[in-house]
């Protein structure tokens, strides 16, 4: 591999690492402080990975959380989280059930919780 190709590959590899959901969430939350416990809601194809990153970084700061992701995108349990999978790109009954779990998780929140 010539030197230009090596440099290009290094740039590509580093860029891809930076946009990975786990790394992006950890970068976004690093240094954040919360006055109390927080609730984490993660939705989408990368939701499980993002929630796991938040859990890894924030630990006991998280009171609870809900993940709603596409079928077969969950990689197992995350302590304190409800994991729900649903249809994508078409909504199905499990998508709706997952959305209801999210609504239940936040229904008693008010502006004081923000």
Which functions belong to the PLM regions below?
Residues 65-70:
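Short internal beta-strands
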């Amino acid at each position: 591999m010539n030197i230009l190709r090596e440099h290009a590959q290094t740039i590509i590899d580093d860029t891809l690492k930076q946009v990975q959901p786990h790394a992006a969430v950890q970068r976004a939350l690093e240094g954040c402080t919360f006055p109390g416990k927080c609730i984490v809601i993660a939705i989408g194809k990368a939701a499980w990975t993002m929630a796991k990153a938040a859990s890894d970084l924030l630990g006991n700061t998280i009171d609870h959380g809900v993940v709603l992701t596409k079928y077969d995108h969950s990689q197992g349990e995350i302590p304190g989280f409800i994991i729900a999978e649903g249809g994508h790109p078409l909504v199905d009954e499990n998508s709706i059930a997952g959305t209801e779990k999210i609504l239940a998780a936040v229904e008693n929140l008010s502006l004081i919780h923000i």
